[in-house]
Regions:
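Extracellular loop-to-transmembrane helix junctions
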Residues: 28-34, 53-150, 154, 261-264, ...
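Membrane-helix boundary/coupling elements in multi-pass transport proteins
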Residues: 118-131, 239-246, 306-344, 390-394, ...
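Helix-loop-helix junctions that connect adjacent transmembrane segments
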Residues: 3, 25-29, 68, 145-151, ...
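A generic transmembrane alpha-helix motif of multi-pass inner-membrane proteins
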Residues: 199, 396-414, 420-476
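Membrane-interface "cap" regions at the ends of multi-pass membrane proteins
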Residues: 2-66, 78-79, 83, 94-95, ...
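TM-loop-TM module centered on a large, flexible mid-protein loop between adjacent transmembrane helices
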Residues: 100-103, 107, 140-144, 259-322, ...
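Transmembrane helix-loop junctions in multi-pass membrane proteins
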Residues: 49-56, 165-171, 304-305, 367-390, ...
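Membrane-interface loop-to-helix entry segments
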Residues: 12, 150-204, 258-263, 399-402, ...
């Protein structure tokens, strides 16, 4: 096996085990390439493409060209980062992809804090957001209020239900991921193809790209806000690496899944935005708000189709929530199996019947529920101080992309056997992309970004105390 220098030669014994055999930690090789691709595509393509489209247009003052540029910029950053991680995935396999790569690059300490952040902030904020949004679209579909307690309880039921499936039926969770991914692509491909054809015929597509906005020149920060907003629509692809210890032939299949999945997502997003231009003017798109998918498909295929597409959207959101929960359910396990975090032996246990870390899954359900309460009562309804009302679906990208940078630098330093393109050019481009994303987040949110960082520091300090306590116990 080709190895890096001292840092990247840390592959554990699990990397050499034959396919189909259980790892020493007990997790089974249960997933194949299509499940991994479905993780990437299915997690990324969810609610974001539907409910962030109007926000992107609004930030760009209705300019479709700039909106498409937004989609392309964030997509390019995702592609470059996924290619770099695909390179890492072909060389290192242990328990939880991104945490494994952090450990290989910078040691156990850095890996611990990455895993702590992913487990307590990144996974659960996305899960809670998607559960709430899924309930919102279900409310639009079935006609119940989308801001009241009915909405709240449906979202919570979706969250807990997904968690229980992942805890007690992990194979079913994988099958759901594959099936919902196939279903969610149907409306997007239809809009991309039919919408573009209709738009070129009725002139709306040409109009969307030629009509100049009167406000563009006076609002230079619009693109930054649009980039941060649409970053959510691309988020979650890294979670596919959380199943690498359960993926058959992971060193071959995970790189393929990351690369192919990312390409599929970017192509579909770009085509979907172009397709939207054939259904209505950009001003009407912005005015439609969360009802944009229903109105766009209604204009294209008739009012009945507008209703049917909401069924697809709800299924799409359910699939994304499931994929995110697959990562959240394994967060505490990725710490416990390294003898790190809270009660490591308890969370490292794997159920012999299901081959799943059930205790870890329950921890994920509880943390996701706490974040769901925050999302509903603090962020949506503002029932807290202003410094604790930052947007949880967008701001964690600051620390996520910042965490990638040291890993990419380590790759450049230690990957001596790699060709210059993989060793220097791709990681450098990825670092620049990460820095750009962090800058955009600060430019768009300013004081709210600082509030989030304050919270992040507190969570990391708690993690430091937990790690210090564990280390002292180990020495006794």
């Amino acid at each position: 096996m080709k190895k890096y220098g001292t840092s990247y030669g840390m592959a554990c014994d699990n990397s050499f085990r034959k396919e189909g055999t259980p790892l020493e930690n007990g997790m089974q090789k249960r997933y194949g390439l299509f499940t991994a691709i479905s993780m990437v595509v299915g997690i990324v393509i969810g609610s974001g493409i539907f409910f962030k489209a109007t926000k992107v247009l609004a930030n760009n003052n209705g300019d479709m060209g700039r909106s498409l540029l937004t989609v392309a910029i964030v997509g390019a950053i995702m592609l470059i980062c996924s290619f770099v991680f695909a390179n890492l995935a072909s060389r290192y396999e242990k328990v939880n992809g991104v945490v494994d790569y952090a450990e290989a690059a910078l040691g156990r300490g850095y890996a611990y804090y990455v895993a702590w952040f992913m487990t307590l902030i990144y996974y659960p904020t996305l899960v809670s957001c998607l559960a709430w949004i899924t309930a919102q679209y279900a409310g639009i579909l079935f006609g119940f209020p989308i801001t009241g307690m009915t909405h709240f309880w449906i979202g919570l039921a979706i969250l807990v239900g997904d968690g229980l499936i992942n805890a007690y039926a992990p194979k079913l969770a994988g099958k759901l991921q594959v099936s919902t991914t196939a279903i969610k692509l149907v409306p997007l491909v239809l809009m991309a193809v039919v919408g573009t054809i209709v738009g070129l015929s009725n002139g709306l597509t040409v109009q969307a790209f030629t009509a100049a906005s009167q406000q563009i020149a006076s609002q230079g920060s619009g693109l930054m806000g649009a980039i941060v907003a649409f970053a959510f629509a691309y988020e979650g692809w890294i979670i596919a690496t959380s199943i690498n210890s359960e993926l058959k032939d992971a060193k071959k299949n995970l790189p393929l899944a990351l690369s192919l999945g990312a390409l599929i997502v970017v192509a579909i997003y770009m085509a979907y935005f172009v397709g939207l231009t054939g259904t209505m003017t950009t001003a009407d798109m912005m005015a439609a708000g969360d009802l944009l998918p229903e109105k766009a498909f209604g204009n294209l295929f008739g009012s009945a189709a507008g209703t049917v597409v909401f069924v697809f959207i709800v299924i799409s959101c359910l699939g994304t929530t499931n994929g995110l929960m697959m990562g959240a359910a394994r967060g505490a396990y990725s710490l416990g199996v390294r003898n790190e975090g809270i009660a490591p032996r308890f969370f490292a246990k794997v159920d012999q019947k299901t081959g799943m870390a059930t205790n870890s899954a329950w921890f994920g359900i509880i943390i996701c529920t706490l974040w769901y309460l925050y999302w509903h009562f603090f962020f949506i309804h503002g029932m807290g101080p202003s410094f604790f009302n930052w947007e949880p679906d967008e701001l964690p990208i600051i620390t996520l992309y910042a965490a990638y940078i040291p890993m990419f630098i380590s790759l450049m330093v230690n990957a001596r056997e790699e060709k210059p393109f993989k060793r220097f050019i791709l990681p450098t481009a990825a670092i620049l992309g990460c820095c750009f994303m962090v800058y955009c987040a600060f430019a768009a949110y300013r004081i709210q970004a600082l509030y989030y960082l304050g919270f992040f520091v507190v969570v990391m300090l708690i993690g430091a105390v937990v790690r210090s306590t564990n280390n002292k116990k180990a020495k006794v």
